[in-house]
């Protein structure tokens, strides 16, 4: 890939991200190939000086992965300025794709020192708390829809904001098949869902992200969210 173009496009996305601006759509080659998308994402993230408070999984809906012919989701960094407490207002634009109901976990910083292979059998010892959250998903580009998984991945994981609810101490409960709904209080519209849509279940999605950040040798040296 042309390093000069990579640097130019990443600078434009970073400027849009930090200054809450919109830019014209980036070249398709950065979206069509997920490897190029991840490279652009990492390049953009390396230029952000805001504190990282955690990571997110993106493209975890199995029907979406199948439709886009991708084998797995992606992950991206979440910054302090993009996390709001429940009840705060978020300004959106016409390029917002939607709102997703999520489960987030607070992970102990000693995870970064662990040499163990991450699995369902040992993952829970690293979790301190869990909380419901809403993710506002969208672009910093003037484009709509999702043609490639890289559309989401390349643009800071398509994360606009996270709204986090009240944290509770983690308990080993089965949340792999729970019905959910999001209600619009203004028009009374309700959108139904199920936790099983999140890469089989939320814990499976969590394990996916933890394996990726361990592979990439990331160490925040503090507790963090996923």
Across the structure, where does each feature detected by a protein language model lie?
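A conserved acidic, glycine/proline-rich C-terminal tail/linker
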Residues: 202-226
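Catalytic-core "active-site belt" of small-molecule-metabolizing enzymes
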Residues: 2-201, 207, 215
